[in-house]
Swiss-Prot record:
This is Homoserine O-succinyltransferase. It is found in: Cytoplasm. Its EC number is 2.3.1.46. The keyword Metal-binding does not apply. It catalyses: L-homoserine + succinyl-CoA = O-succinyl-L-homoserine + CoA. Belongs to the AB hydrolase superfamily. MetX family. It comes from Pseudomonas fluorescens (strain Pf0-1).
Length: 379
């Protein structure tokens, strides 16, 4: 990290923790008696509290979306390319809130937190969560911060699903919804990928039925495999071909099953190794189930247009040409439903070779379109 922060950075940020003691009823039929949500804010809330923007994170995301926690940080927050002075989500204009969702493993109450009833980590006993549960908890955070209505709720992938759910559950509290590289529900193939990832974790002997913390271990192999499978789906065939091709790590083949021979193998193992050291296995299970369960149209006889009839927000939907995890066809399905419901909707399909992860990458056309939409939001 250079001695001075870039001029378009939000600079040093300090996470804050909000404690909630009012029980939160969950879709699974259980409730949490009390819980914490860790969050960060960027920019300044105006006197009318009309410039607040909520950032909803994807599966492995967290509250640290922009800026730096220390001058020694090697990298800024995960969406730093989009949040800051003069960036698409301009902190000179907006007050930005980014949190780690309930069930997460970065400071909000989740499976790795201590269960006050037992004095041990919740582990697998932590209740299964849904996107709507998250939205309810986010609404409580908004209340705490004095935000009656969001100028915009924004998210990519699973974050986009949360943004969509906000317009359904709290239609009066969202003026703009930006759903990026997202979908109105998972396809069978997507559910299948999630199940393979879960089985990698569940069948790891070190998982111990979710109580691995009590045994002083982590299901590292299962987490690595889950991340490796997931990461393949976040990239496109073209981007993998361009980045790795059939390149070898050494000059010759070893003719065995143990060596890391291809560059792509090395990359996947690195991603799995890094992920297994920072992410909680039970949280991974929770996040993938929340993805699987998201299907708001199920409450409206599978009529997606009817699902959004009560929404009052304006919508911006963006997709990427090579995203096969949440393909442009899924975004167009959403756009068609919104138009059928007579909603104000903008749609852009961005030509990008990076696959699903493109929403995290500073692609010029993407940033320009993103910024142009945000500039049109009146406060």
């Amino acid at each position: 990290m250079p001695a001075a922060f870039p001029p378009d950075s939000v600079g040093l940020v300090t996470p804050q923790t909000a404690h909630f003691s009012e029980p939160l009823a969950l879709a699974c039929g259980r409730s949490l008696a009390d819980y914490d949500l860790i969050y960060e804010t960027y920019g300044t809330l105006n006197a009318q509290a009309s410039n607040a923007v909520l950032i909803c994170h994807a599966l492995s995301g967290h509250h640290h979306a922009a800026g730096y926690h220390s001058v020694d940080d090697r990298k800024p927050g995960w969406w730093d390319s989009c949040i800051g002075p003069g960036k698409p989500i301009d902190t000179n204009k907006f007050f930005v809130v980014s949190l780690n969702n309930l069930g997460g493993c970065n400071g909000s109450t989740g499976p790795s937190s201590l269960n006050p009833e037992t004095g041990k980590p919740f582990g697998a006993d932590f209740p299964v969560l849904t996107v709507e549960d998250w939205v309810h908890s986010q609404a409580r955070l908004a209340d705490l911060l004095g935000i009656g209505q969001w100028a915009a709720v924004i998210g990519g992938s699973l974050g986009g699903m949360q943004a969509l759910q906000w317009t359904i559950t709290y239609p009066d509290r969202v003026r703009h919804c930006l759903a990026i590289a997202s979908a109105p529900k998972l396809s069978a193939q997507n559910i299948a990928f999630n199940e393979v990832a879960r089985q990698a974790i569940l069948t790891d002997p070190e998982f111990h039925g979710g109580s691995f913390q009590e045994h002083g271990v982590i299901p590292k192999r299962g987490l690595m495999l889950a991340r490796m499978v997931g990461h393949i789906t976040y990239l496109s065939d073209d981007s993998m071909g361009e980045k790795f091709g059939r390149g070898l790590k050494s000059e010759k083949l070893n003719y065995d099953f143990h060596s890391v021979e291809f560059q792509v193998e090395s990359y996947l193992r690195y991603q799995g190794e890094e992920f297994s050291g920072r992410f909680d296995a039970n949280t991974y299970l929770l996040m993938t189930k929340a993805l699987d369960y998201f299907d708001p149209a199920a409450n409206f006889n599978d009529n997606l247009a009817k699902t959004f009839e009560g929404a009052k927000a304006k919508f911006c939907v963006m997709s990427f040409t090579t995203d096969w995890r949440f393909s442009p066809a899924r975004s167009r399905e959403l756009v068609d439903a919104l138009m059928a419901a007579r909603k104000d909707v903008s749609y852009l399909e961005i030509d990008a070779p990076q696959g699903h992860d493109a929403f995290l990458i500073p692609i010029p056309r993407y940033l320009q379109a993103f910024g142009n939409y945000m500039n049109r939001i009146t406060l």
